[in-house]
């Protein structure tokens, strides 16, 4: 008998020869139709068909867990591979990984050996995939010596698989299959093809074998897979909506920002985009002031010695930009925290001063490969709304709790009401003592639990210096965006020898808390553009009011209205062009102005305004003071 310990600490006995599926069906029957794989001792993920061979802590993985989701998508990649080789007998498979960012959740790179594949071929491939699903093949696994595997794939002419096997250090490799078809793979996979009911091929592109332009050009087919048609349909709806809302398209239409060939990956903010950027910064700056934060600024270029001391030189080197000053190595900062710690260290500190909260809108630079750049979502220069808090250890939980409240206050201000929260735990490559990591992780959990906030666990996805809370916001079309973080850091205070004098006169190390709410202003603005479809709420809108004249006779009256509104603090544009009013209205609608003031002789004579609100066809007549009062009330009501 073996013993398996569940997450609730209950222990279950398992008979010899039982598979993990047998165990789930007996002990956890409510999960038998959702289970995709199991995770043992927090790291070893195995198929449900594997025989239990040891005592272990066990987690059942479903589609809602990341590892379960990855198992599902990777199995769908195998489904695609089998369908392609059933239809195209000469096709050679290479690799079929799971991805998080791209036009699909998985892809397979395939050498069709001269056959041209286009999206028009997708229906035929999808039909074969559906046939395989309906056949409900059992997914089998076999472990064989490398020599045998090479001989097997040589007979099939699978030259890429032979090359992959040659790079594997182990003397054995695993093969997964359905029916007579099989593929080289580490796994894990779902138990049978019938589980993969809902899928869609989404895109096609070219890709060089091993990303080397001197190698063969392959065909990369992307796809997505879901447990149900409802979830697939929802995803496809999101994709179509996302195309309409693409922040790159809307940003160009509203003249918010651009990217230039002289600086790929570096956004250029135009006047209206700068208004939006400043609105976000000003709001958060005011909220920080209410909560006792002190704003600082640190240099963009700092000595390599600093980055070696902070650990970034070893852990972040490939993402940094370097320069030489006076024959010494320097780097553009990829993060703000080391500079902030130098400011803390510049003075002596007493326990009476702590917690000490520093805030910085810090511009950072990180090298990203050209192929992963994506509008404002993935750039090489961005501004973080960083805060670094230095506190005694006993203040950690209260500070984290306050930051949680602060974070949700900000998100709700922008109209976000649904969230998912995760705790990311210690990665393999990390720094610090085991007891500090355990204490910090437990404190983050307790802080969320006391606020009644449910959370998931992202095993091994914390920063190298400490665990973190990740805040995900759901936008207006149901997509989740990871934005804010709260990170606990015991490493940097130790590395920089930061201390304070406690009440007993002894020097002690503070704990350091890294906090960001937007994450980066650039990315958060991209999210807002797509969330609102460019129709920003009045308080941050760069196009609040457009004044349109019907005839030239009212130009002076329109200018007088313009000046009054500008003096009241609003962003106003005046259109006195000698154009038909219909054309002016259409142009203003495209600019997504919150309000149009359509002024003719009637309004001039009565001293009133004809007001049309964005999204409405009718106009209302208001006094000038009444309109200003309404605008002020609308901004106040935004929270």
Curated annotation (Swiss-Prot):
Its EC number is 6.1.1.3. It is found in: Cytoplasm. Residues 1-62 form the TGS domain. PROSITE patterns: AA_TRNA_LIGASE_II, TGS. The keyword Protein biosynthesis applies. InterPro entries: aa-tRNA-synt_IIb, aa-tRNA-synth_II, aa-tRNA-synth_II/BPL/LPL, Anticodon-bd, Anticodon-bd_dom_sf, Beta-grasp_dom_sf, TGS, TGS-like. One of its GO terms (biological process) is threonyl-tRNA aminoacylation. Keywords: Aminoacyl-tRNA synthetase, ATP-binding, Cytoplasm, Ligase, Metal-binding, Nucleotide-binding, Protein biosynthesis, RNA-binding, tRNA-binding, Zinc. One of its GO terms (molecular function) is metal ion binding. Binds 1 zinc ion per subunit. Its cofactor is Zn(2+). GO terms for cellular component: cytoplasm. It catalyses: tRNA(Thr) + L-threonine + ATP = L-threonyl-tRNA(Thr) + AMP + diphosphate + H(+). Belongs to the class-II aminoacyl-tRNA synthetase family. Catalyzes the attachment of threonine to tRNA(Thr) in a two-step reaction: L-threonine is first activated by ATP to form Thr-AMP and then transferred to the acceptor end of tRNA(Thr). Also edits incorrectly charged L-seryl-tRNA(Thr). HAMAP family: Thr_tRNA_synth. This is Threonine--tRNA ligase. The gene is thrS.
